């Protein structure tokens, strides 16, 4: 049976039955108010448009890196500081400290996708796949085009043996970023694996 976190994920990405949208908990639905300011949103939207039109992987990778840098800023100095300290804690192998910081951050700014994506990373490093799924779902509820969260979800599904679901997630990422190398390589690998399995 599909686990609840995965079910919510697939609902958010349109990969499960249409009725699932009504079944998702309110906390997993997209927020009505964006976290970032209008100027940052406009810059990100422009980068996403360029990403969709990128002609080669090198261009796409560069644009994704710029989007990642934008995603690191919430519009709140306190939020940005908590995220930075959590990243430093992870780099120092202090995952529990990072989780505590990210707990505080997600409570402070529950609409910031990057905070949930960072907490999902800490969950994964702490050996908690269920929490990883839940926090990635929240990241994607806040920002369905968060490429890092999509890539992490695809990898998690692939690691758990859900190749078909993982492929659909990577294909969704490629709809946003057709030339993005990590998603394209993962999708190609999974298509080959699934084709070999079906022979």
Predicted feature residues:
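N-terminal leader/linker segments that initiate helical-solenoid repeat arrays
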Residues: 2-3, 19-83
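Terminal, low-structured helical/coil segments at or just beyond the last alpha-helical repeat
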Residues: 25-35, 62, 69, 73, ...
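Alpha-solenoid helical repeat scaffolds
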Residues: 48, 65-68, 103, 137, ...
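TPR-repeat structural position
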Residues: 57-60, 95, 129, 163
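Alpha-helical adaptor scaffolds
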Residues: 76-149
């Amino acid at each position: 049976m599909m686990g609840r976190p995965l079910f919510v994920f697939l609902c958010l990405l349109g990969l499960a039955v249409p009725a699932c949208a009504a079944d998702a908990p309110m906390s997993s639905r997209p927020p009505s108010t964006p976290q970032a300011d209008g100027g940052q949103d406009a810059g990100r939207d422009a980068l996403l448009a360029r990403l969709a039109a990128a002609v080669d992987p090198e261009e796409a990778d560069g644009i994704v890196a710029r989007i990642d840098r934008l995603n690191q800023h919430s519009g709140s100095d306190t939020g940005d500081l908590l995220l930075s300290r959590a990243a430093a804690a992870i780099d120092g192998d202090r995952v529990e400290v990072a989780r505590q910081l990210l707990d505080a951050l997600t409570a402070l700014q529950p609409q910031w996708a990057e905070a949930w994506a960072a907490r999902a990373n800490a969950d994964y490093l702490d050996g908690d796949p269920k929490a990883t799924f839940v926090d990635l779902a929240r990241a994607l509820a806040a920002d369905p085009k968060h490429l890092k969260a999509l890539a992490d979800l695809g990898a998690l599904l692939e690691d758990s043996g859900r190749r078909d679901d993982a492929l659909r997630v990577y294909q969704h990422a490629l709809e946003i970023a057709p030339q993005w190398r990590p998603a394209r390589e993962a999708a190609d690998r999974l298509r080959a694996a699934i084709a070999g399995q079906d022979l």
